[in-house]
A protein has these predicted regions:
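Glycine-rich, basic loop-to-helix element that forms the pyrophosphate-binding segment
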Residues: 66-82
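Non-catalytic, C-terminal membrane-associated alpha-helical segments of glycosyltransferases
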Residues: 233-240, 247-332
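A conserved acidic beta->alpha catalytic loop
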Residues: 23, 39-48, 94
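Short aromatic/hydrophobic "clamp" motif used to bind/position activated sugar donors
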Residues: 87
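Short, flexible, basic/aromatic active-site loop/helix in glycosyltransferases
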Residues: 118, 136-159
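Conserved donor NDP-sugar-binding/catalytic core segment of glycosyltransferases
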Residues: 99-132
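A short, conserved alpha-helix in the catalytic core of glycosyltransferases
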Residues: 163-168, 172-176, 182-215
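Short, acidic, metal-binding catalytic loop of nucleotide-sugar glycosyltransferases
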Residues: 22-32
Length: 332
């Protein structure tokens, strides 16, 4: 049995796939782990590249197919297909640094630990714009909770690990219901927080979420995301996602209360006019407004879907995965 399954979920990212797998292979070989790639309904050259990678790397690389479009469904497929007790998720844009997997696995010596995540450092195709500063960089998956390993809780000052660099004890994640398809990305609907949702359920069940600062990945940021328009859209969808998460896990009235106590003091109602050079302070305020607007829209959306969200609250089964063909690639 492998010590861990490094899971890379991908959808139509053939150009990035070889680099993503090569980056994971170095860590896998050092720790007797497998690399498991989940092809999430790709329509490009991804299946052919995966077959070649499986042939090239023997039993170290496996591939499975998830026909249901959506990152949450792909992550659940990774949970179901993993042949080890720990799954470590990487984005197909992420490359782990040496020692990443060892740092992620170390906290699992404590049986109370169900999730461990690490630091995410942004890397750019070109020169990043001068306006890209905290807190805006978090929208691009930058994540840093300091230099000290510690337990994370759902409380002010703590942020659960991000999905580009997160791991779970498989049995605990499955028992908690896996990743919710109500809050994760789906095609052009780039909602977030499916990993936050799973962490929250583990947390309230008394399981431990840990931060491992030595588990570092570099995350590539493509040029198309380095614009104020993309940043504004991302914050709007972050607000929608936040409202869905609150309604699903904490109830409608608490979700409504957060609009008042969290968003209202942070929002200044001024018009944002994009112009060059970009004024960083104005963009940060505009993103806060868009997030608040998205949260309000998410409350409406979540209220209309209240019964569905309530039904999804308890743990739900993870669908079985297809059998592997002799070449190591699973197909529907």
């Amino acid at each position: 049995m492998p010590a861990a399954s490094i899971v890379i979920c991908t959808h139509n990212r053939a150009a990035l796939l070889r680099r993503a797998v090569r980056g994971a292979l170095g860590e896998a070989a050092a720790h007797d782990a497998e690399v498991l790639v989940v092809d999430n309904a790709s329509a490009d050259e991804t299946p052919a590249i995966l077959e070649a990678l499986v042939r090239e790397h023997g039993g170290r690389v496996r591939a499975v197919h998830e026909p249901e479009l959506g990152l949450s469904a792909a992550r659940n497929r990774g949970l179901a297909a993993a042949e080890s007790p720990i799954v470590a998720y990487l984005d197909d844009e992420a490359t782990p640094r040496p020692g990443w997997l060892a740092a992620l696995l170390a906290p699992y010596r404590d049986s109370a630990v169900s999730c461990v995540g690490g630091r995410i450092v942004l890397r750019f195709e070109g020169t990043p714009p001068p306006w890209l500063v905290p807190p805006l960089d978090a929208a691009l998956s930058a994540y840093d909770q300091g230099d000290r390993p510690r337990r994370l809780r759902y409380r002010p000052g703590d942020i659960y690990p991000f999905g580009a660099n997160i791991s779970f004890r498989v049995a605990d994640a499955v028992a908690a219901g896996g990743f919710s398809t109500a809050v994760g990305p789906l095609g052009r609907r780039q909602l977030v927080h499916d990993e936050t949702d799973l962490c929250f359920r583990l947390d309230v069940a008394g399981r431990e979420i840990h931060y491992a600062p030595a588990a570092v990945v570099d995350h590539l940021v493509v040029a198309e995301r380095l614009s104020p328009a993309w940043m504004l859209r991302r914050h709007y969808l972050g607000g929608v996602s936040g409202a869905t998460f609150e309604i699903k896990n904490r109830g409608l009235w608490r979700a409504l209360g957060k609009l008042r106590w969290y968003y209202r003091p942070r929002v200044t109602w001024e018009r944002y006019v994009p112009r060059e050079p970009v004024d960083t302070a104005s963009l940060i305020r505009a993103c806060a407004r868009r997030e608040a607007l998205g949260y309000a829209a998410g409350l409406v959306r979540g209220t209309l879907r209240l019964r569905t969200l309530r039904r999804e609250g308890p743990p739900h089964p993870i669908a079985p995965f297809p059998a592997l063909h002799p070449d190591g690639v699973a197909r529907p």
